[in-house]
């Protein structure tokens, strides 16, 4: 089965969607409540709004991330640091604008949005990389073939 078969694309989209929805719900809620000072209600609203957004952006993000990983492999080989840096850059550059819009849509003020997005970017230095590994794990669970 190649990456471009319908079945492979569906598996890839399902794995990417599952991974992004679960990961962003859990990590986002922790960041919003513990670091950003949002109320539980604001955070829950934000996380519920994020679900359909994450469903829409999950597969495009997976493809975007894969392009970063391929670029890193082409220019730095199989070094773990290059892969981790690619995961970090892909995650922060793709997710930060989306996250800011979600927070704005649920009524977070500019200070909360700035704090949450900046905190998320800082936390992503570890969490973006962790998400990359979680995504790989989900792709294995969904038996996605030839995804990178």
UniProtKB/Swiss-Prot annotation:
Pfam families in the record? AlaE
> Which InterPro entries does the record cross-reference, listed alphabetically?
Ala_export_AlaE
Q: Does the keyword field hold Transport? A: yes
Subcellular localization: Cell inner membrane
Q: Which UniProt keywords apply?
A: Amino-acid transport, Cell inner membrane, Cell membrane, Membrane, Transmembrane, Transmembrane helix, Transport
GO BP terms in the entry: amino acid export across plasma membrane
Provide a Gene Ontology MF annotation, just one. Answer: L-amino acid efflux transmembrane transporter activity
Q: Name one GO cellular component term.
A: plasma membrane
Can the keyword Transmembrane helix be found in this entry's annotation? Answer: yes
Specify the superkingdom.
Bacteria
Transmembrane intervals:
18-38, 49-69, 88-108, 115-135
Query: Where would you say this protein principally sits, based on its record?
Result: membrane
What topology in the membrane does the UniProt record assign? Answer: Multi-pass membrane protein
| Similarity comment | Belongs to the AlaE exporter family.
Give the protein's function: Exports L-alanine.
What protein name does the entry list? L-alanine exporter AlaE
What species does this protein belong to? Yersinia enterocolitica subsp. palearctica serotype O:3 (strain DSM 13030 / CIP 106945 / Y11)
